[in-house]
Amino acid sequence: MDRDFGIFSFLAVSVSAAGFFFGGFQYSFLILLSLMAIEFISTTLKETIIHKLSFKKVFARLVKKLVTLALISVCHFFDQLLNTQGSIRDLAIMFYILYESVQIVVTASSLGIPVPQMLVDLLETLKNKFKRKP
């Protein structure tokens, strides 16, 4: 009984902390987490296939994912401070969803997997919308 209480307490604290740091688990955030996992796994498997896998590369990629989540958290904090109702966080999440999607397509292409032109065009259009204007 005590063990179950400890597990549920840990889960409750974890979900509360995630809500504080990331503003909850809306679909856009869950999509981002899923794409980050897919990109991490697919790139790691690609490096395994081409015999270029190293602990240093995997660790660096993991650190980048954690820093991305930290940036999402910072955006959420700014939303709270500026009372923008999540628009800064949502924009950042959309940017990183696009980034992770492009990385997955690049990985698939480098493995020789055909990528539908419609998907390439869609990602290119979205990428152009997120580019900075001079």
Swiss-Prot record:
Alphabetical list of InterPro entries matching this protein: Phage_holin_4_1
Entry's Gene Ontology cellular component terms: plasma membrane
Keyword hit for Transmembrane: yes
Keyword Transmembrane belongs to the record: yes
Domain of life: Bacteria
Entry keywords, A to Z: Cell membrane, Membrane, Transmembrane, Transmembrane helix
Annotated transmembrane regions: 5-25, 30-50, 62-82
Chief location of this protein within or outside the cell: membrane
A Pfam short name: Phage_holin_4_1
Membrane topology: Multi-pass membrane protein
Subcellular location: Cell membrane
Record-annotated disulphide pairs: none
Family: Belongs to the bacteriophage holin family. Cp-1 holin subfamily.
Protein name as annotated: Uncharacterized protein YtkC
Organism: Bacillus subtilis (strain 168)
Taxonomic lineage: Bacteria, Bacillati, Bacillota, Bacilli, Bacillales
